[in-house]
């Protein structure tokens, strides 16, 4: 089992006083944990406050970067130092300590930036208290939740469950699977790949539903059907072909 704790301070020369430590250069940032992953993996990221980005592409390794959102803030640096990265049996976990004594949903929390590069088709589970979650590239099934912040999944290959109490949710281009999207305050936007059929079930308490999909030629099988369940208490829902996004 490979286990490593990302320490932002390790990127700097130990002789430099903390108050004078520079922002890490591109060369210094290359000392990031790398795992050999010839097949898609399962990614789980849990942060209290910050930005989480998982990028899927045609690659045979997984690279993890954890940085303070602001290298000049001691609290952000400490949060990055304490973030733990573990990889075993095709599963990657990135977690920050749950210190609810210093956490507040109103902002001002220590914040970090997590970036994970994975093989195409990898699954992604992510949670954040305050922040933003982005899934880029062709990811597998995604389960994402943010208390306050936006969620974006660009090109999912499978199903997506995304929930935020306050924020927007956007799916760039869905081809198949089930999309379960829910926000209390915010907009929901779904792009359907041209040629794929869609079955919609939307619930909006205060807002509007804009179905901009055109007809699809021929009967569509399950492999080319997207089932969308979208719910917003206060906000709009937009369903459209991805080419129109």
Task: Indicate residue ranges for each PLM-predicted region.
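Short, Lys/Arg-enriched N-terminal segments with co-localized hydrophobic residues
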Residues: 11-31
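Short linear S-[DN]-x-LW-Φ motif typified by the pepsin-like aspartic protease active-site region
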Residues: 28-88, 117, 123, 237-245
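Residues that act as N-cap/strand-start positions at coil-to-secondary-structure junctions
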Residues: 29, 39, 48, 77-80, ...
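Right-handed parallel beta-helix
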Residues: 33-36, 82-158, 223-245
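Surface loops and adjacent helix of pleckstrin homology
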Residues: 48, 57, 67, 97-99, ...
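Extracellular beta-strand solenoids
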Residues: 54, 116-118, 135, 153, ...
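Short, surface-exposed interaction patches in beta-rich subdomains
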Residues: 168-245
């Amino acid at each position: 089992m490979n286990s490593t704790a990302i320490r932002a301070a390790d990127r700097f020369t130990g002789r430099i006083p903390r108050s004078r430590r520079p922002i890490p250069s591109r060369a210094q940032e290359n000392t990031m944990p790398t795992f050999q992953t010839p097949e898609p993996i399962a990614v789980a990221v849990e942060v209290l406050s910050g930005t989480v980005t998982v990028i899927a592409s045609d690659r045979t390794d997984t690279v993890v970067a954890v940085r303070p959102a602001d290298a000049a803030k001691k609290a952000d640096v400490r949060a990055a130092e304490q973030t733990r990265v573990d990889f075993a049996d095709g599963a990657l976990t990135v977690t920050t300590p749950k210190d609810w004594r210093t956490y507040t949903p109103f902002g001002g929390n220590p914040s970090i930036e997590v970036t994970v590069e994975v093989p195409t088709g990898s699954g992604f589970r992510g949670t954040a208290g305050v922040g933003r979650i982005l899934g880029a590239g062709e990811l597998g099934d995604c389960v994402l939740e943010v208390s306050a912040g936006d969620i974006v999944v660009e090109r999912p290959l499978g199903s997506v469950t995304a929930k935020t109490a306050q924020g927007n949710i956007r799916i760039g281009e869905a081809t198949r699977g089930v999309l379960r999207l829910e926000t209390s305050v915010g907009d929901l936007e779904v792009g359907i790949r041209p040629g794929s059929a869609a079955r919609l079930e939307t619930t909006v308490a205060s807002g509007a539903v804009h179905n901009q999909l055109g007809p699809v030629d021929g009967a569509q099988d399950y492999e080319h059907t997207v089932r969308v369940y979208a719910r917003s208490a206060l906000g709009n829902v937009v369903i459209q072909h991805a080419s129109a996004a």
